[in-house]
Amino acid sequence: MTDLIPLEQAHCLPRKGSDHKLGEARLTELLPQVPGWELAEAGMALTRTFRFADYYRTLAFVNALAWIAHREDHHPDLGVHYDRVVVRYSTHDVGGLSENDFICAAKTAQLYDQGITA
């Protein structure tokens, strides 16, 4: 991936095998580009909790996120609650985090920041 375009404008590419697993140096470079997201599971996953006023807005966000996930062919694990969604990205095919996780994290944050569900 090129760092010349913002992550939220990039698109996911098929990534398989440990060659695509991000190392510590690359994780350190990419994490500041997705504010609010945290490394979890010893750097094997990327997580963030998004909060909403009610269940309707929570589910509207989940449905919009499902469309992004389908379009990018990269799907998060979701914990859906009345007023929040916990989003977790990891690339199973590489055994950890890939650039696809950061691309989708940026797209997810952009969706939330745009107030699509407000």
From Swiss-Prot:
It comes from Xanthomonas euvesicatoria pv. vesicatoria (strain 85-10) (Xanthomonas campestris pv. vesicatoria). It comes from the Bacteria. SUPFAM superfamilies: PCD-like. It catalyses: (4aS,6R)-4a-hydroxy-L-erythro-5,6,7,8-tetrahydrobiopterin = (6R)-L-erythro-6,7-dihydrobiopterin + H2O. One of its GO terms (biological process) is tetrahydrobiopterin biosynthetic process. Keywords: Lyase. GO terms for molecular function: 4-alpha-hydroxytetrahydrobiopterin dehydratase activity. This is Putative pterin-4-alpha-carbinolamine dehydratase. Signal peptide: none annotated. Belongs to the pterin-4-alpha-carbinolamine dehydratase family. Gene3D superfamilies: Transcriptional coactivator/pterin dehydratase. Its EC number is 4.2.1.96.
